[in-house]
């Protein structure tokens, strides 16, 4: 989550909370998952507190802020409620993500270019908490330029279209978009992270891209953990990223 010469792994624990909320139980505990992830080599922990509270709850975020040994990457929509909460929690990293249809691009990233004044105000306000603010956007030059204009020091490129690509041609096209987006972002002085839909069979090509600071991965880790345990799932992903990014 901080700029590094080696590629970092941010572990998203949202779907541990999804499993808990499915039955309204106290288990499985996303905080325990976060601590296990750190032990297994995670460089940071990502959580998304959604307006509908479908997985992570405020209490999870408060507890994580107190116990994490790495850093929290707090994903949030651009709302007054979330801004006030972030100001109270003061996470090390904040990533602004789309939550409503109006904020989405067709690909699924935040439409920064279409709402620059609103995003600029949010970035400036959140930066005053001391957080490094990033924007979850498509690997699109227009959105990357807008991200720089609004003052965000970092971006997270949306890798969902690459993850969803089915034919070798589509995969190559989407990977090329990411490669070009990374180069364009780095060229504009931005810290470039990436994530969404990455799993054990598609992560290596993205991890091999020079210039990416961190990959944020969640659902694939939680799914694999059902069979191998959470620490092993994280360690396996970390090893893939380290090997591919050498």
From Swiss-Prot:
Alphabetized PANTHER family for the sequence: PYRIDOXINE 5'-PHOSPHATE SYNTHASE (PTHR30456:SF0)
Name of the protein described by the UniProt record: Pyridoxine 5'-phosphate synthase
Lineage per the UniProt record: Bacteria, Pseudomonadati, Pseudomonadota, Gammaproteobacteria, Pseudomonadales
GO MF, any single term: pyridoxine 5'-phosphate synthase activity
Active site residues per record: 48 (proton acceptor), 75 (proton acceptor), 196 (proton donor)
Record-level GO cellular component terms: cytosol
Function: Catalyzes the complicated ring closure reaction between the two acyclic compounds 1-deoxy-D-xylulose-5-phosphate (DXP) and 3-amino-2-oxopropyl phosphate (1-amino-acetone-3-phosphate or AAP) to form pyridoxine 5'-phosphate (PNP) and inorganic phosphate.
Cited Pfam families: PdxJ
Alphabetic keyword roster: Cytoplasm, Pyridoxine biosynthesis, Transferase
Main subcellular location of this protein, as a coarse class: cytoplasm
Record: residues binding 1-deoxy-D-xylulose 5-phosphate: 14-15, 50, 55, 105
Site, Transition state stabilizer: residue positions: 156
Database matches in SUPFAM superfamilies: Pyridoxine 5'-phosphate synthase
Organism: Pseudomonas putida (strain ATCC 47054 / DSM 6125 / CFBP 8728 / NCIMB 11950 / KT2440)
Top-level taxonomic group: Bacteria
NCBIfam families associated with the record: pdxJ (TIGR00559), PRK05265.1-1 (NF003623), PRK05265.1-3 (NF003625), PRK05265.1-5 (NF003627)
Substrates-to-products reaction catalysed: 3-amino-2-oxopropyl phosphate + 1-deoxy-D-xylulose 5-phosphate = pyridoxine 5'-phosphate + phosphate + 2 H2O + H(+)
E.C. number(s) listed in UniProt: 2.6.99.2
Binding site for 3-amino-2-oxopropyl phosphate: 12, 23, 197, 218-219
Family that this chain belongs to: Belongs to the PNP synthase family.
Entry's localization field: Cytoplasm
Pathway terms, separated by semicolons: Cofactor biosynthesis; pyridoxine 5'-phosphate biosynthesis; pyridoxine 5'-phosphate from D-erythrose 4-phosphate: step 5/5
